[in-house]
Regions:
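Glycine-rich phosphate-binding loop of ATP-dependent small-molecule kinases
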Residues: 2-167
């Protein structure tokens, strides 16, 4: 990986965009940390997208990602990619299927534009069984060093495991 990263940096022909998505506790953060260990972190830009800010709500939906895209020759890692909000909003009943379809169409157009501009997009979905997800949530919750990571929304999403898997 390190050699490939330096080849990318030297050629500066295209940016690499890595999307890490998946169920809660599947290891997205750990995967990002490993990539930082295996490659030169000076040339990796990592972004963990959370709740929309007031400014982001006033802008087009892809703006928050657009401004964080890596330049040619660099790597950008996104946790909580542009797929996260549309999927969670649909699973939690905040949007209907028709709106999800529209959002997915916008995402496809966004990714197509990035690819047409030469970007390489690598998308990874990290999965856990429902049982293993529950075990990891409980383990994180019990440990005083990691309990802060488990929020009410994590348990709310866990209860919607089957619906999220279908979407």
């Amino acid at each position: 990986l390190l050699d490939a990263q330096f080849d990318l940096l030297q050629s500066a022909r295209f940016p690499v965009i890595i999307l890490l998505a998946g169920v809660d506790c599947a290891g997205k953060g750990e995967t990002m940390n490993l990539l930082h260990e295996w490659m030169d972190p000076r040339h990796i830009e990592s972004h963990a997208q959370r709740e929309l800010t007031d400014e982001e709500r006033e802008r087009p939906s892809m703006w928050r990602y657009w401004r964080d895209l890596p330049p040619k020759g660099k790597i950008g890692i996104f946790i909580g990619s542009w797929y996260s909000s549309p999927l969670i909003d649909n699973v939690q009943g905040r949007t209907k299927n028709a709106e999800l379809d529209q959002q997915l169409d916008r995402i496809i157009r966004f990714e197509t534009m990035l690819c047409n501009e030469g970007a390489l997009i690598l998308k990874f979905w990290l999965h856990l069984s429902e049982e293993n997800q529950k075990k990891r949530l409980k383990k994180l919750e019990k440990d005083p060093k990691t309990s802060w990571r488990v929020k009410d929304t994590d348990w709310k999403n866990y209860k919607m495991y089957d619906r999220l898997r279908l979407v």
